[in-house]
C-alpha cells in the first residue's frame, strides 16, 4: 500500500507483488520507481506513475530473504543485502538480471546499507549478530576499503551530507547509536561518540532529506529524533531533539521536502 502522509489514508494498492513477506523498500531518486525486496528472495521495480503499477525489473541473485535495499544518490546503482550474507550491486542501466558485484564479505545478514551523498562510489554496509562489522566499499570496483568491528549487531546506517561522518544503530547487545569519522586518506573509521537512549534494540534509522536530522526507532516502541552531524562543538553533536510514539517516516518523494511526517 502507498499512503498519503498528511491524512494517513491509503491512496494506492500495489496488489500482490511477491510470494512472501515484503520487508524492505527503496525509492530510486531519479526514476521515482519503488524497489521492493521480499522473503521470496526476489527484488522488483514498480513504476507507480503508470496504471496498474507494472513491474519493470526483476533481480533474483539472492537465495534467502532480501533484508536491505538502497539506491545510490544518482539512481544508477542498487545495493541489496540478504539473509544469506550476500551483498549485491546492480547496474540500473543493465538489462541483464545479474549483479556486477556479489560478495559474502559479511558473516551475517546485510540489513544496514547507506550510500555516501557526496562520494558517489562510497558505500557503507553493516552485518548482523554473527558479523558485527561496518564495512566501507568502493562500489565501482567492489573492493572493501575498511572493515570495522563494532562488537554488536548493526541495524542501520546514515551518512552526513559532506563531513565524512557515519551514524550506525545497533541491536543486541548494546542497543546504541554511534557516530564514526571516515578518513579516506588513512582508510580508517574512528568512533567519535556513543548515544545510549533506547532501552531495547534499535531497529532502523531514517534521515531527513536535508540531512539535518536522523530518526531512530527501537523495539522499546519509541521514535527518537537526533541532531547528529552538528558541525559546531562536540557538545552539540548527538543531541536528542525529539521523542515520539507515533512512528511514521521521512520521504523526499512524497513528503515534498524535509520534515517528519
For each predicted feature, which ranges?
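A short beta-strand motif characteristic of beta-propeller blades
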Residues: 9-14, 54-59, 98-103, 143-148, ...
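WD40/WD-repeat beta-propeller blade N-cap
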Residues: 15-22, 59-66, 103-110, 149-154, ...
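WD40-repeat beta-propellers
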Residues: 1-4, 43-47, 87-92, 113, ...
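Terminal intrinsically disordered, low-complexity extensions flanking WD-repeat/beta-propeller proteins
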Residues: 151-153, 160-162, 173-179, 183-261
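Loop/turn segments within WD40 beta-propeller blades
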Residues: 25-32, 70-76, 114-120, 150, ...
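WD40/WD-repeat beta-propeller blade-loop signature
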Residues: 21, 30, 65, 74, ...
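Conserved strand-to-loop turn within each blade of WD40 beta-propeller repeats
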Residues: 37-40, 80-84, 126-130, 169-173, ...
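Solenoidal tandem-repeat scaffolds enriched in leucines and small polar residues
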Residues: 20-96
Amino acid at each position: 500500500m502507498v499512503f498519503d502522509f498528511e491524512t494517513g489514508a491509503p491512496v494506492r494498492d500495489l496488489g500482490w507483488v511477491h510470494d512472501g513477506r515484503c520487508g524492505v523498500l527503496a525509492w530510486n531518486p531519479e526514476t521515482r520507481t519503488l524497489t521492493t525486496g521480499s522473503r521470496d528472495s526476489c527484488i522488483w521495480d514498480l513504476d507507480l506513475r503508470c496504471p496498474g503499477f507494472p513491474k519493470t525489473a526483476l533481480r533474483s541473485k539472492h537465495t534467502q530473504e532480501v533484508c536491505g535495499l538502497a539506491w545510490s544518490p544518482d539512481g544508477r546503482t542498487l545495493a541489496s543485502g540478504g539473509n544469506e550474507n550476500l551483498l549485491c550491486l546492480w547496474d540500473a542501466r543493465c538489462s541483464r538480471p545479474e549483479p556486477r558485484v556479489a560478495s559474502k564479505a559479511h558473516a551475517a545478514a546485510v540489513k544496514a546499507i547507506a550510500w555516501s551523498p557526496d562520494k558517489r562510489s562510497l558505500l557503507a554496509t553493516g552485518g548482523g549478530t554473527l558479523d558485527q562489522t561496518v564495512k566501507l566499499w568502493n562500489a565501482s570496483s567492489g573492493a572493501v576499503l575498511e572493515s570495522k568491528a563494532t562488537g554488536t549487531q548493526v541495524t542501520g546506517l546514515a551518512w552526513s551530507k559532506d563531513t565524512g561522518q557515519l551514524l550506525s544503530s545497533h541491536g543486541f547487545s548494546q542497543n546504541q547509536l554511534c557516530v564514526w569519522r571516515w578518513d579516506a586518506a588513512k582508510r580508517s573509521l574512528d568512533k567519535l561518540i556513543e548515544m545510549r537512549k533506547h532501552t531495547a534494540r534499535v531497529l532502523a534509522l531514517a534521515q531527513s532529506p536535508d540531512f539535518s536530522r536522523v530518526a531512530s526507532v527501537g523495539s522499546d516502541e519509541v521514535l527518537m529524533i537526533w541532531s547528529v552531524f552538528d558541525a559546531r562543538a562536540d557538545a552539540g553533536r548527538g543531541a536528542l531533539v525529539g521523542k515520539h510514539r507515533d512512528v511514521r517516516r521521512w520521504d523526499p518523494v512524497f513528503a515534498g521536502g524535509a520534515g517528519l511526517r
